[in-house]
Amino acid sequence: MKKKAFDYEKLLLFLLCIGFSFLFYGKTIAVENVNYGVEQLHQYNHELFKQNIGLMEDGFSPRYYANVIVSVLMNLLKMSWAGVATLIIRANFIIYAVAAARMVCKVTKERRLLFGAILVSCMFRSSLGTLAGFGLNGAMDVFIGTGTALVLLGISFLIGEKKNWMAAWICLSLATLMHVHEGMWGGCAVGVIWLTVMIAGKKIDWKTLKGLPVYVVVMLLVTVPALLHGEAVDETLFAEIYVNIRTPNHLLPTAWGTDVIVKSFLLLLIPALFFAIRYWKDRSETKSRQYLILSILSMALWLLIFAVQYFGTILHPSSTIITMYLPKCFKYMAYFAMLLYLKIADLLFDEERYLQSAFAILVLLLGCDYSFAVTMLCAVLL
């Protein structure tokens, strides 16, 4: 039996993505880490910050397991919190890079190196927008970045012909341990892919759900103790403080700006139109049908998240909806859009429609800009 030749191009792709990722590495630890750092240091030494308002005196933090990891690493490696945080941040960049390299291998066979550089750049710049202030680039945040990176890695196991659902569920479970919101909304993103595959195949493959119980158990371990120790709050007062005063940029839809909201949805709509036209012209294009389904489901989830967030913060304030941080899901829909634009560029290049392929890449690189979005729309319709 002939041995399969070693794929040096794939190795080069992984090295390129890792090297390119670290071009976006910051020289300082993000200030957001200080909030979680209080919990992590308190886990390391319970005598620290005992009266800090950020600690749950009688409750259970959803970040408990992540805090334990930091504490264990500090003891094991004999390092300061800053040293351990730096190691985790560097690991985040590597996981991001591996996720990007794996994804590019699934999207194209001919233009891996080019697409690898493009995807890494777009991920770390959040090129398709940061609706509600949540972008894909969280690598400089301890554990938020780890959770996001693990979700992206999990998604990379589900694109293309060969899918590894167990690996994806494990990545989601680990992401949940790192940060509950990333695990939760990453799970919704994986759910979109699962529905896409099931609808396209016109049947439910129960084998794909073998790893789901692991994910559910981890989610329960993280969320149930915190919910059991919850206290009754005045919903209106909570919304006023938490949404309107503390984080309107993240949680209040009316603070995001109509312009940003429209652009965000438009960037999801264009790939859907492209694959709809492609499938309408040739019904044998099964791949186009799958990408069309993915586009439609992504838009449907986007609209659902926006509607629920609007209802739960403005029309009928709900502390449950507010603390779930639903808008974090938008960044995963933006990631799907990135992959769809890469696929569009790849298909158009194969068909020697180089100008249109370039437009797709320009939209991907420049993101939320009406002029390029409209140009791409015209290119799609030609």
Task: Outline where the language-model segments fall.
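Membrane-interface alpha helices of multi-pass inner-membrane proteins
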Residues: F157, M166-H181, G191, Y215-L221, ...
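Transmembrane helical bundles and short interhelical boundary loops of multi-pass, membrane-embedded
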Residues: L297, I305-F311, P317, Y325-L326, ...
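Hydrophobic transmembrane alpha-helices of multi-pass, membrane-embedded glycosylation machinery
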Residues: I170, L174-T176, M184-M198, L273, ...
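Transmembrane catalytic cores of multi-pass membrane glycosyltransferases
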Residues: S21-G37, L41-Y64, V180-G186, M198-M338
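Membrane-interfacial loop-to-transmembrane alpha-helix junctions, especially the N-terminal start
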Residues: E9-K10, E110-G116, N164-W165, K207-L212, ...
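Membrane-embedded alpha-helical segments of multi-pass membrane proteins
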Residues: I88-I95, V142-L153, G187-C188, L268-L269, ...
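Membrane-interface transmembrane helices that cradle and orient dolichyl/undecaprenyl
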Residues: T146-A167, A200-K203, F349
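Active-site lumenal/periplasmic loops and adjacent helix-entry segments of GT-C-fold
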Residues: F6-K10, I18-V120, L131-G147, L177-E182
